[in-house]
Amino acid sequence: MKKILNGTDQVVEQMVEGLVKSHADVVHRVEGTRVIARNDKRPGKVGLVSGGGSGHEPAHAGYVGRGMLSAAVCGDVFTSPTPDQIYEGIKAADQGAGVLLIVKNYTGDVMNFEMAADLADADDIKVEQIVVDDDIAVEDSTFTTGRRGVAGTVLVHKIIGAAAEAGASLEELKALGEKVIASVKTLGVALSPCTVPEVGHPGFELGDDEIELGIGIHGEPGFTREKIMPSARLAKQLYERISSESKLLAGDKVVVLVNGMGATPLMEQYVFANDVHELLKNAGVQVEKTLVGDYMTSLEMAGLSLTILKLEDEKWVDMLKLPVDTIAW
């Protein structure tokens, strides 16, 4: 295992310290916690909290700041943060109008965020929760009941963040979030696995000429293994599955996110994005916005995911285009 670390037991602690020291103009650490909170406070605004296991950087701390999240909670690598840590995030985000929790659909995350919401309720903080389940690869897995929450979560952060910044109520934000979640679909592929520092070996093995379709962001293997193929053919496989799930038709408008899994160069991501654009053009589907880059990773996994957000409301594009002050958007 080759990693730039000072040992495996302090990796998250030192990452959090490095992050807040590097971006002290945007975020700060809530003392005694692994909560990253935005510096600017807006009384009367609904707070937005997300988080989960570390190892997916820049998610989620990279999306804390004006226009997006109020706070993010960092668990151990690929491990949900504890309810008490999440509760600290809720308190940091609360500005008197309630707090919305944006949770990826993993059993530990959902359970711990719900427990934290109960703690907040006992402290008279109104909390609502939405659960992102955009991964169409599998219905149930080692980590989930139902579909997993993956890169589409970042689009949810951005749209909900814009609405919150504009003064939407807690109930309005929850309803909007549920609409966006229902319209966003993701599917990923791995060219090589990742290694959790404390484990010391890859989560699965792939031959030099193999790829894994349907991988998760915790190093979970996918639903099928195939030989390496040209980008255009790979794009077609992922696109066709997503198109079928989303029932995309000629004339529909979409947002595309090509997300690097951690070790795939931008050159390859843009080659893939070009192939996706050709497929959408041939299908008569109009692309309103495209995002390409590492938005939600899986440590040093090589590969990418394709996310397509079907626009049920054209205002969502405007929300995605609004400027923010965060580390990673």
Curated annotation (Swiss-Prot):
Organism, as annotated: Listeria innocua serovar 6a (strain ATCC BAA-680 / CLIP 11262)
PROSITE patterns with a match to the protein in the record: DHAK
Chain residues that bind dihydroxyacetone: G53, S54, G55, H56, K104, D109
E.C. code: 2.7.1.121
Domain DhaK: start-end pairs: 7-329
Keywords: Cytoplasm, Glycerol metabolism, Kinase, Transferase
Main subcellular location: cytoplasm
Known function: Dihydroxyacetone binding subunit of the dihydroxyacetone kinase, which is responsible for the phosphoenolpyruvate (PEP)-dependent phosphorylation of dihydroxyacetone via a phosphoryl group transfer from DhaL-ATP.
GO-annotated cellular components: cytosol
Primary gene name: dhaK-1
Other information: Unlike the carbohydrate-specific transporters of the PTS, the complex DhaKML has no transport activity.
Compartment annotation: Cytoplasm
Protein name: PTS-dependent dihydroxyacetone kinase 1, dihydroxyacetone-binding subunit DhaK
Catalytic site: H56, H218
